[in-house]
């Protein structure tokens, strides 16, 4: 009987918590999300980016071309979502041609790298990157 009473007290003590311990709850946290795409394709490259815009309630799809510097090196392509209040981002990016050049995405939330993925295409497959992830934990 003493063991049962002791276990009951332990469970009761552990289950009690206050909201004052969690000052910045995930529901109230605002995140700055940065999605950075890079390519190893020489001279020219274009990717198709699609994602669901929760605020607009619609899918967004656009082709984006990489810009190259004077040395022919590709510059990173960035998507920035400041003050993002949503829990997730759902989308993908793909190269709309057959190339074996690598396509890479890095997803940063408040400056912290959360996701890094790389994809290489072939002469029969597009390089495709899934950019779906949870922003809040």
Annotate each predicted stretch with a short phrase.
Residues 1-18:
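Sec-dependent bacterial lipoprotein signal peptides
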Residues 13-35:
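Bacterial Sec-dependent N-terminal signal peptides
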Residues 28-40, 84-93:
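Noncatalytic modules at the cell exterior or secretory-pathway interfaces
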Residues 33-70, 77, 129-131, 137:
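Extracellular, modular beta-sheet/disulfide-rich ectodomains of secreted and cell-surface proteins
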Residues 48-50, 104-108:
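Beta-strand signatures of extracellular beta-sandwich domains
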Residues 53-103:
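Mature extracytoplasmic domains of secretory-pathway proteins
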Residues 115-137:
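C-terminal partner/receptor-binding element of secreted or periplasmic proteins
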